[in-house]
Amino acid sequence: MIEIGETMGDQPTNKIVFCERSWKAPVSILAFLILVTFAWGAYLLDNYDEDDYFRGSDDMSVGQFLVRNVAMPDVQRLYYTVPPAVVGVGGGGVNAGPVASGAIVGANGYVITTLHSVANVPDITVQVATSAGIRRFPAQVVKTIPGHNLALLKLQTTEKFLHFRMANIQTVVPGQQVFAFGRNMAGAPLVRQGMVQSSDAPLAVGTTQITHLLRSDAVYSWEQTGGPLVNAQGDLVGINIAATGPTGKVEGFTVPAQVIVSHLQDVVRFKTGGAAGVAPPAAQTVAMGSSSWWSKAKAVVGGPTAVPGMGMNVVQGTVTTGIPSGMPFVDTDHVGGAKIGGYSIADILGLGMLALAAGVTGGMMTMGGGVLQVAGMMVFFGYGMYLIRPVVFLTNVVVYGAAALRNDKAQLVQWDKVKPLIPWGVAGVVIGYFIGNAIGDSVVGVLLGLFALIMAGKAVLEILQPNAGEDTAEAIAAAEAGDEMDELMALAEGTTRPKTSGIALPEGPTRSAVLGLPMGLFSGILGISGGVIEVPLQRYIGRISLQNAIANSSVLVFWASVAGSVVAFIHGGSTGLIHWEAPVTLALVMIPGAYVGGILGARLMRVLPVRVLKGIYAATMAAIAIKMLTTV
């Protein structure tokens, strides 16, 4: 029996020595080649999705990129080059697909799309094709133009992007070859070649009648809505609107480039294309077999009908077709005229008048001017809160800084009471700024409308009080009992007295927080000055005279606005939401009007009857409330 572990007999000696064999060298070479193969594979896996074709294209327009290596681009290069500047616009859900297309018009990530597509989207996300594949960027509305169904978005990033330059209006002629781009539900690009058919075609979107539109048969699907219509040079002719006609088929409209530039050049510094080159022959447009996405995206003549709910109904009107072939379109409403810093004279006057009205309102009633300024910039000029906040903060720094200096010179500022409140006001505006950004412009608009409604109701109740506004000694005495209307009259006469009623809080951090924090929060969230909150707090909790309350509030608003400006520019700049030029320019336009309006309002307070002042204030706040609450 043999036990495990034992050996049986003598084993032969192994005389084969591996290292002495002749195949040592081939095996070593093979092992080396295997290592090289794995290293090369790792490199390919790490870099397989990068596309050298677009390398170095940051901060370039599509037209510039097309002619970088050739004198005149062919259509095949156009099909391949344009899609990176075409984006998909949708919601913020993980699996949410695009609700519209869009066009990048600024290297810093400015995107134009159709307003109706994003009006009810709470968290806007933009899908951008990059050399590393499709990337999703959060975006915010910077400005809207309801009259032309346009929305300007800003990607929340500091990266640079390939973008469109605007076509010269003199190069757009009837019969011109154009290409309508978009992105489908899967995010893949689609395009159709067509031509410019006519100009000034009417289109109704809801209750809004849009004019100055182009007609083009290149638009065949709702997925092209918001996407670019480009010419053979890669320049942006306009933004597409796909509308369902009476037969259910898609009819193509385009908001032309000159309209876009006219309304948005205050925010974006557009590049403009030069004279038109020779258009490539039509025969070149059919060969795209080398591009797989083009094979999938080719449109059938006539196109599919629009997806239900995604198109818009066309209001049938007379389409202009009498322009001779080869003649350029003429749009005197949007082309020409004096511009200052990208603003038309009409826009400068409008912004100045809004600032003047806000200043007068604040000067007459010592509050409410900021509400009017913010609401006016949202409703009449279409600006988003990301741009409004820094503008209002900068305006307040100048206006309330000057007011604080005047009040300090008149020895009305109670520094011993104000200094403990400043840190709370600064903290409040910082917190409020981020809360306002988080809840979005739509919610801010509702809150602003509700706030204005409350202020209007308060003013109406004061008007309805017995003996309101009577110029008598009893009216002055009534200020001590809390009659706000007569306090206003007493302020005009310089006879206000300390408040004897109200809420008594002991000195300390709690009292400072109650007096300083709410003003900062409201200022940061709504973008208003906060004086409308701080003056009553100073009166009823601080228990001081109306003159001292206004003086103390001017100091708090000044420091809160300084903090708000710093936060808005640092946060906005670091996230790519704003660039300093636009808010600074807007502030420079509005500051003179707000300053002069404040002085004029203070004089009107001394001239007009208090009941009239309260009536004007109530009507103004009511109008703001109605407009804000009915447009959301």
Swiss-Prot record:
Segments of this protein annotated with the region Protease-like:
78-268
Lipid bilayer topology: Multi-pass membrane protein
Known cofactor(s): a metal cation
Q: Which UniProt keywords apply?
A: Biomineralization, Magnetosome, Membrane, Metal-binding, Transmembrane, Transmembrane helix, Transport
Question: GO CC terms for this protein?
Answer: magnetosome membrane
Give residues annotated as binding a divalent metal cation: 148, 263
Single Gene Ontology BP annotation: proteolysis
Query: Could you tell me which InterPro entries the record lists for this protein?
Result: Peptidase_S1_PA, Peptidase_S1_PA_chymotrypsin, Peptidase_S1C, TM_pro_TauE-like, TSUP/Inactive_protease-like
Q: Where is this region: TSUP-like?
A: 365-632
**Example GO molecular function term?**
metal ion binding
Compartment(s) where it occurs, according to its Swiss-Prot or TrEMBL record: Magnetosome membrane
TM annotation in the entry = 25-45, 340-360, 412-432, 434-454, 513-533, 550-570, 582-602, 612-632
Question: NCBIfam families annotated for this entry?
Answer: MamO
Q: Which family does it belong to?
A: In the N-terminal section; belongs to the peptidase S1C family.
Q: Extra notes?
A: This bacteria makes up to 60 cubo-octahedral magnetosomes of about 45 nm in diameter which contain membrane-bound crystals of magnetite (Fe(3)O(4)).
Instruction: From the Swiss-Prot or TrEMBL record, give the protein name.
Output: Probable membrane transporter protein MamO
Give the source species: Magnetospirillum gryphiswaldense (strain DSM 6361 / JCM 21280 / NBRC 15271 / MSR-1)
